Amino acid sequence: MTVRESAARTAAPSRGTWLEHEPLAGHTSWRVGGPAERFYQPADLDDLVQFLRALSPQEPLFWLGLGSNVLVRDGGIRGTVVCTKNRLRVIEARGPACVYAEAGIPCAHVARFCTERDWVGAEFLAGIPGTLGGALAMNAGAFGGETWSLVRRVLTVNRGGRTIWRAPEEFEVGYRHVQGPEGEWFVAAELELAPGDGRAGRERIKALLARRSATQPTHQPSCGSVFRNPPSDFAARLIEACGLKGHTVGGAQVSLKHANFIVNSGDATAADIETLIAEVRDRVALLCGVWLEPEVRIVGEAQA
């Protein structure tokens, strides 16, 4: 028995979902990606803690939320994928204008929860197509707001299953960047809002979503923005200036609606998308002298 086989057998959770060779195309917003060697969805936070305590320290781990902002290669992911989608969804009020939300909660749900209680400041979260855990991990933002501007404190878990409350000061936070203690993952956060007009907040959410629908390819599989905006410019402007709107590789296409989106036209592979990302980056570098940094994470094994 290999180390990984042993890890899989000893760590199989008692209450969560445990699958082997689970195709990840159904768990990513691009609708591409090979299989996870092992795939685990916790029943709740306590189940996750028990799972990690039983897991071999040699077992590779990858954390997945709604599967946006990530490109899983066609060969899939070795080790165990911990998927919080539709799990870790507890959300509750914690005192005046403070919300506790677990990592698997969609950002849009957090925004609605707050405005329903006449708390404002989180409306921009409705424009982030991912979970709170993913938003915390990269300081996701939309429409001028950034996730960590709301954070009072975060709850992390380490490989040994220990949960730790940490203050924002313990992290290096920047534009689409968060760095903290090694070997810990976000499982919840307390967010601080401001008392306000919930009805007006809901109207702002409605307006933001209408703007998003008008400017982004929301009805096609994508990961959200592919590249970070360079200083004092916009990735979409540079890509469009290079004549790349509509450019395709296989089933992957630079969106005709928003140049910083790559969409799956129906039959794209992860390899198509990765090749298109590289072609766009190289063309912008050649014609504009700007090296675009990917916002999307590219993970997993290439197809053998």
UniProtKB/Swiss-Prot annotation:
Pathway: Cell wall biogenesis; peptidoglycan biosynthesis. Residues 31-196 form the FAD-binding PCMH-type domain. It catalyses: UDP-N-acetyl-alpha-D-muramate + NADP(+) = UDP-N-acetyl-3-O-(1-carboxyvinyl)-alpha-D-glucosamine + NADPH + H(+). Its cofactor is FAD. GO terms for molecular function: FAD binding; UDP-N-acetylmuramate dehydrogenase activity. Keywords: Cell cycle, Cell division, Cell shape, Cell wall biogenesis/degradation, Cytoplasm, FAD, Flavoprotein, NADP, Oxidoreductase, Peptidoglycan synthesis. This is UDP-N-acetylenolpyruvoylglucosamine reductase. GO terms for biological process: cell division; cell wall organization; peptidoglycan biosynthetic process; regulation of cell shape. GO terms for cellular component: cytosol. InterPro entries: FAD-bd_PCMH, FAD-bd_PCMH-like_sf, FAD-bd_PCMH_sub1, FAD-bd_PCMH_sub2, MurB, MurB_C, MurB_C_sf, Oxid_FAD_bind_N. Belongs to the MurB family. Cell wall formation. Pfam families: FAD_binding_4, MurB_C. The active site is at 176, 225 (proton donor), 295. It is found in: Cytoplasm. Its EC number is 1.3.1.98.
